Amino acid sequence: HNLPAAAPYSGEEGWKELCRRDDIDLVYICTPWQLHVPMAVYAMEHGKHVAVEVPAAMSLDECWQLVDTAEKTQRHCMMLENCVYDFFELTTLNMAQHGLFGEILHTEGSYIHNLEPYWDYYQGNWRLDFNQSHRGDVYATHGLGPACQLLDIHRGDKMNYLVAMDTKSVNGLKLAKEKMGAETFANADQTLTLIKTERGRTILLEHNVYTPRPYSRMYQLTGTEGFANKYPVEGYAFRPEQIAGEEIPDHENLSEHSFIPQAAKAALMERYKHPIARDIEEKARRVGGHGGMDFIMDYRLVYCLQHGLPLDQDVYDAAEWSCIGSLTSASLEHNSMPVAVPDFTRGDWDKVDGFRHAMAQ
């Protein structure tokens, strides 16, 4: 491609030199979690837009640092939440925006992923070390991001408060003893969070990276007119009269109260395939990156920057989705007491009418 060789930067302070360059527009941060905010803030203060891996921030104070710096510098700060770009999520979001599910009342999301084969890949045990000292849902964004887009969070609704519960730590503690010699482990084997929104909807989150449960981000929505579910089985359900040719189920046969047939599902997904997926799906699947969603995420980031459009994920998304770790910890430490979710928009949560992907005219 006749591109110049990449310029290497190393050492504890090398990244600052990169941020100070005047020929860079965007700084892309993929480091251990604790470095996300210092690097993002420094980059924005030096005139750079920022794309930062998940979670973007690890404390409430860090969430506010990102918001305040982005507002002060007028730089974009996008958290790299890739799961909002998976194909089922994009299509289901498009269906929701066309009203197929009626009013969405409840959503579910999770990060259930047995990391037992992967812990050694985290240099210096940085991820396990963080979990060892932090209780709560420390990795909520993969499940929460798609849920928030469905519910138009800070675009017509907002998260008001949450409560969290967790199990004791068994596998996590055993793992930490083996790898770090730790005698205590704060992060539970299973953590659950319930969130209530201003408009009376709910979100359920789960976190579990220690037990042999099959991988799941749950991704589920319950609406007044329909239902969608991704894990463990993709499917949709609607009122019988919404689907042409469907008979009313026999109430004595519970197996008939089920998903629409596969042929109807396939036709529905093709009809409501998201315009972004329709445009770029083939190339995204060919290039790959978690099945193509990483490619779509980067494509959308560059597309919006090049066309001067609002990013799909703004700094308020980054703060809202990342603050769950701190808030669930506070709830758990006070016997699952409700904890308020900050309004990072400072009152502007209903100024935008619904979530939409910005497109150039």
Give the positions of each predicted feature.
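A structured beta-alpha segment of the ubiquitous adenosine-cofactor-binding alpha/beta core
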Residues: 6-26
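Glycine-rich phosphate/pyrophosphate-binding beta-alpha loops
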Residues: 189, 205-215, 289-290
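A short catalytic or substrate-binding loop motif that flags glycine-/basic-rich loops and adjacent residues
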Residues: 141, 184-189, 197-198, 212-213
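N-terminal Rossmann-like dinucleotide-binding module
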Residues: 1-3
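Short, well-ordered coil/turn residues at beta-beta hairpins
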Residues: 30-31, 194-197, 206, 211, ...
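Beta-strand-loop-alpha-helix segment that lines the small-molecule cofactor/substrate pocket
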Residues: 25-26, 32-33, 37-85, 99
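C-terminal helical cap and adjacent loop that interface with cofactors, partners, or active-site loops
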Residues: 148, 214-222, 229-230, 240-361
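Predominantly a Rossmann-like dinucleotide-binding segment in NAD(P)-dependent oxidoreductases
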Residues: 73-78, 83-185, 301
